[in-house]
């Protein structure tokens, strides 16, 4: 099963992957992140056809995680938001880890959660879910996974 969680950088270790991560429960969907390079016009006046080169990569800015919204997950995400606010005040980042079975490494992303729990989508005879838009700070990619606590 795929597992997902977060960790906060330790004091004195800003920019370093946290040594511990807390697992979040009832995750329904973890959005993908595609880094799309911007194109830069590298044409000269004598060129009859535009020449482009790859520029800085663009992540799209946000990354959505959908959660089955229960009293337990509400508490988990309230604690996450509080942990982020404490970390931010100390100049530290929050990292998110996605562990996929069969891989030795996990996916890591540095991101900022919303300041409050968003209103969930409510549908007739539907599962109560909430989408958390995480602002992408840095896509770290895959590296050695850290076991969840």
Name these PLM-found stretches.
Residues 1-69, 112-127:
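Solvent-exposed edge beta-strands and adjacent loop segments
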Residues 5, 91, 136-138:
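Short, flexible coil/linker elements and helix-boundary hinge sites characteristic
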Residues 75-111:
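Short, acidic/charged, Gly/Pro-enriched secondary-structure junctions
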Residues 1, 6, 142-149:
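Compositionally biased, intrinsically disordered low-complexity segments enriched in polar/Pro/Gly
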Residues 69-73, 139:
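Acidic glycine-/aspartate-rich tracts in secreted/extracellular proteins
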Residues 33, 97-143:
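Short beta-strand and beta-hairpin "edge-sheet" elements
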